[in-house]
């Protein structure tokens, strides 16, 4: 099935679901409240079914991915705008594949958790917005899934830009129309920041096309030909900045982060999961795929600056998180700190750092997603986002408290959980080149223990707050939503090899393109490489003991 259009079908399935949802009767259809509830339930079930079909199809695609095969697999290239060399070109390497898998796992989870979000059931007291269309909410969610799959799969820079910008539209409406509090302000701020970054990237994309026409060659936006352009060091530096600023805003990396706390706090929990769990990863993915691959000289030149910004972001996000009193805002600032750790691993320019950073993208998506969902479940019961309005929850809702604890411990990278593997690799990879940065990043991890444990202590332990005395524990739908994320955090923490094996060859290719070949990651498809990898792990364990 090597010629089967896996990626196209994966992206089209959610669009088909969106069309089916749009064809269902709306609120203006005749009938009473019971009929409206039945129609809303049908919409939710359609969205869930199509998201699960997308997940199953993506798993089948991953099974057919050949480790040790060509760098980009499941490729498909068709002319789109031939006059300007624009193609519909898609394909995935190991990095893109694991991020697509993370995306299609999170979407059905979010649908289950967001079952009543469109009606405002999870809003704090006094913050319920006007009742909005359930059809529109879940249609936007499925459209967003298509955009997210497309942005990771694109192998044409112009196509990537289209998906990169198109993602803003459904998320803008999900925040502005279905959010809480200052939702419109947060949505506009999110949109303006993103559009500013996108404008800079568009200028760089056009410049790339112009340089591709040098020597009378036909211009192209295809990724692979552009990666082999002979660009001067000066040109690479300027084009790097155009792409990097757009990705730093999307990630977000300090000091481009200020839109995130507002957007994540105003968004419904499900939308916040996709915002922090997936859309942020588009920024860090872009740094690996485009900044380093297309502009290696520019990447090397700006590496010290990016390392410095990453360390500042790690410490700043952690320190500000400690002072937060709003539950969702605290989790948002933890992401600012964690994204700094991811960019640190990327620009350490080592195999361990980039493998760890990519694995951290996946781990962070699951761990922070679980935190946001459970926080949303708490807010829907207590009708408050203030940490001080909780207390003693573990006595009345032990399952909720237990899962919240696991998600929180993942946030501080407890050994045995997937985030520990990620942070360990990032720190090891960084320490081999930037010892001071690695030490300062470790301080950020220590601070993470403070804000996570403080949050848990204030909300879950101590005397039972009278306002939460009747709080019900998680019910079946909520367990089905958050349970898979907790399971993945544990499973990938105990056995990360399948994911790391997918990532390793792609990281190797990226480092080769960046003219960094020492150390070279062992190739998982090579027996000698596997032995070397095992020997390295054993040696590291012995050294640590």
Listing of model-derived features with the role each one plays in the protein:
Residues 1-6, 21-139, 214-230, 530-531, ...:
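Transmembrane helix-loop-helix hairpins at membrane boundaries of multipass inner-membrane proteins
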Residues 254, 368-372, 438-470:
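Predominantly late transmembrane helices and immediately cytosolic-facing juxtamembrane segments
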Residues 63-87, 122-123, 128-129, 199-257, ...:
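Juxtamembrane/interfacial segments at transmembrane-helix boundaries in multi-pass membrane proteins
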Residues 18-32, 108-126, 173-182, 251-265, ...:
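C-terminal ends of transmembrane helices
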Residues 3-13, 94-103, 157-170, 236-247, ...:
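Structural signature of hydrophobic alpha-helical transmembrane segments
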Residues 28, 37-43, 136-143, 147-235, ...:
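Alpha-helical multi-pass transmembrane bundles of energy-transducing inner-membrane proteins
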Residues 8-27, 48-63, 102-117, 144-146, ...:
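Central hydrophobic cores of alpha-helical transmembrane segments in multi-pass inner-membrane proteins
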Residues 1-2, 149-155, 288-302, 342-362, ...:
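Helix-coil boundary and interhelical linker segments in multi-pass alpha-helical membrane proteins
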